[in-house]
Amino acid sequence: MMWAGVWLLALVTTCSGLYEDQIGKFDWRQQYVGKIVHGAFDTTSVDRIIVATESNVLAAISAKTGDIVWRQVLESGSRGEVKLLHVSNPSATGARVGSRGHPGHDVITVTGSLPALVRGWNSNTGTLEWEWSLLPSVDDQAAADAVWFEHDGLLYHVVPVWGSHLEVTPYQAVSGQQARPMTSRIAASWTAKDRCALTESFFACTSKDQLLALDLAADSSSAILSKPLGAEGVGRPRPVRGEAAVIQNGRYYSLRTDQKLAFAGKDAALVDRTIQEGEPILLRGTVDRVNNRLLIVAHRLRDFVKLDPIEFTIDYSDTLGDPELISVRCKQSNSGNSGAGLVCRMLLSAEDGAILLIQQGKIKWVREEALAEVATADFLDLTLSDAEGAIEEELNNKNGDVYGAFQRRITSQALHLKNLFLHILGVGPAPSKAQRAGLVRDDFGLHKMLVVVTNSGKVFGIDNVSGKHHWIRYLPSFVGFANNVPMKLLVQRTSRFYPLPAQCVIVGRDRMTLNGLLYIFNPITGQPVQGGGVVELPYSVSQISLLHKTGPDFLKALLLLDDKNVAHVVPETLEVYADNFYMFTANHQTGQMNGFHVQYNPSSTKASKLTTTPSWQIDLSGGSKRQQIIACEGKNPIEHVHSQGRVMADRSVLYKYINPNLVAVATHGADNIHKYIMNVHLVDVVSGSIVFSMSHKRVRPPLHMVHSENWLVYSYFNDKARRTEITSIELYEGKTQTNGTVWSSLDAPPLPMVERQSYILPVAVSALKETITEKGITSKHILIGLSTGAVAEMSWALLDPRRPVTSPEKAREEGIMPYMPELPMPHEILVNYNQTVANLRGIHTAPSGLESTCLVLVHGLDLFVTRVSPSKTFDLLKEDFDYFLITIVLTALTTTSFVVKQLASKKIVKQAWK
């Protein structure tokens, strides 16, 4: 009972609640589906589009508003990859309908490969009606390369054995029974993985200067169709939706007829059979990037006669990638003849992931599905208002004497009075563009610009209060780095240095050359700096860092280390600030870490005056050379450590080991005895010394790490116990501090005291992040992203490695709870209550203007933005604060003090006359 009471008190002090009327007041969520792979208009409803996406999502989208009607998130990874989407009844993509209808499950999907799951869905509600699985007796690679198509009510499973043959098996869609007793083996020695594609029931490949194809649904499948290309085929042929045709070498080739049409490589194509009652109509989309226009035309395939009612020229923003026509649906208007009164809706998918609906030559709505794949993000302070900017500019003016300053103050005050008078009359100066958009800094620093960079190269400026997209930029040539390392977003200058604007830089790789690319821009307006803002680097980037010192314009330079270990500074005029700088690189495959010392040599005759010298090297691959680096986590460069010690029960101080150069490195590899081993090393990247190492046996990823102040927290999966565990490590110098002002890794400080402890989590972890505040005074909590889509705010008191296993009496004086292996996960600690984030992948935190409050972004398939207060809002009045009552109390106290003062003075006078 005593321990139960202690636990209850601990949970009461750490939990936080949310009133019903506060839902959506401090947070918002935006839901997405991802980039479309398959899609069709649902003919059972005029307001529903069925889509399957790259994010393993099956969803229905409203054709009127673009909102999600229903959404089913399938299995993650290759198990949930949608290989086929079939919408029963005549669809806008011309899908042929078998003689057998299947009411109640008018949507069929095939996902995964080992096993392949065939499912029937209800398009009205999105509920699963039936399911069957197929486990083919082939190897993993062949199963992954398998494709599916639907023909006359049968599902065909095609397994290509490259360079040999094709294995084709038809199945009944609902029951899963084989329609034929034997699997057909069709000889196809001309097939190759990078030169073949499936279009309708045809399997087409390029072979030198020929296009070869097989109709897999025909009775005589052994007949090979051959078409001359005129030149050697380059790459895989591009299938045309809705028709057995491909686009190759700038031409459209029909596989059912001898038709051949000239076609540009990036032109979108779609064939539809519902516009003119079974007549195949070819729709073609061409983008004019000079004028930002999209031209869509339609021709009858039989005689290539143009359909004038379907010819649109649409404004197509440069923030949208090249389009792909997914589906079309046309109906006859009330006024007319056949073809003359067509009203059409067209579904498009852009290369950047955006989903567009075009109706009668205008874009009806756009869904920015690039936000379903967030690479990195950051919160930026907004600019000052015009009045605050004028005051700031006056205070920053250091020139002149006291009389000049007095004159400027009088002039500015007179100008403020004039503007106030004109504003009262309604004829004041027009507000600035930022003020009209509401992009002005608030008093508490809670209103910020959220800059989000996506994997497709699209950049968004989002209001963190309302969720509005203020600006969008598309960088089609930008991709992430090797080993799935995403693009980097770095802040070179914040909005504090008025009137200089804020400046950020995005670092990535060129999609074609793999050399470094920079995009320098203003994060508040989204406008590029100096021309287009894109800087092409003549080298590949292996490491990135911001310099600590700023130049004359308060700009932090960017230090880059190329693949030849040569240092570069952007801009080059700030090279002098890179002197005596240390960098490191980590090779994930070999487990090697290397340190470098960068020096500035003003007497150098080379173009760059920087020299890079190797300083240390560490091999973390182990004796078996099997260990590979799976994670490398440093500390947040903007964090502040307020308290450098911890008060013990005997009133002594245990000083924290606060090493800003400490990096946590995790390696993982197979082992002959323990199956696999994970090692965690704390490495000083300036001196190259390993401060601490820890080994976990029979442990495997996913691994998530948080490194802050003097502690490290990481989660992993314990394969032996079949559960998720989380380990916390704390480092202390001892009861004497080496140097409390300046830390130097070259002075060989003593090895730290290490406290460590492991705990059990009842649910799998998807992300970890610590809260951060402006001064570091507020207690730090750990935000745990769960596989369920929830985010738990875990107090450090529960993760404290000093929680005693025995003798809890001593620790009770310090307020430390006794050790229990299981960590509680009550609903009260979930910061997103029922606003779950599907496929949660990351959490980003940033300080606000209030020391008590931390801003949080949770991203996955959805976006969720909120704010948390680990130590409550001690610096902010509550919303329900009774201002009327406090006014009455203050008025009464003030009046009483004056009355008492008068009475006391009269009493003193009377006593003096006695």
Describe the function of each predicted region.
Residues 3-914:
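Secretory-pathway ectodomains
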